[in-house]
C-alpha cells in the first residue's frame, strides 16, 4: 500500500472509530461517552498501524520498528479496545500468512482456540467460521461504490440495536 493510500485509509478508520464511539457506548454502557471500553474500529486501526510498522521494519531491517510494532500491538489491552490484543493478532494472522493460503486460517483458528482456553469464551470459537469467506477471497478490490457503506453500517447498526434495547427496556411498546 502506498504512503498516501495508507494515510487516507488510516484517517478514515480513525474518523469512523471516533464517530462510532457514541453509538457503541450507548449500546454497551448506556452513556453517550464512556471510556471503559472502545469499539472494534480502534482495534482495526491499531492492527493497520502494526502492519505498517512490520512492513517498514522488514524493508529497512530495523529492529526498533519491529519493537515499536510489538509495543503498539499491546496498546488495545491497556486502552480497553474491543477484542484487545487478540483482535490485533487476528488481523496479523491473515497479514503475516497472506502468501500461504490455508496457513492463515490455521493460525487464526489456533489463536482463537488459545483464547478460548485462556478465557473460556466458547462463543468466540464461532469466529473460526470467518476463515471460510476470507479463504474464498480472490484478492481483487471490491466495488468502490460500497466503500463508505461498510463504514456507515457499523455505527448505524449499533444505533438500531440501542433503539431496540431502549424501547424494550422502557416498555415503550403498546402491547
Which residues are covered by each model-predicted region?
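Alpha-helical transmembrane segments and their immediate juxtamembrane cytosolic regions
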Residues: 3-175
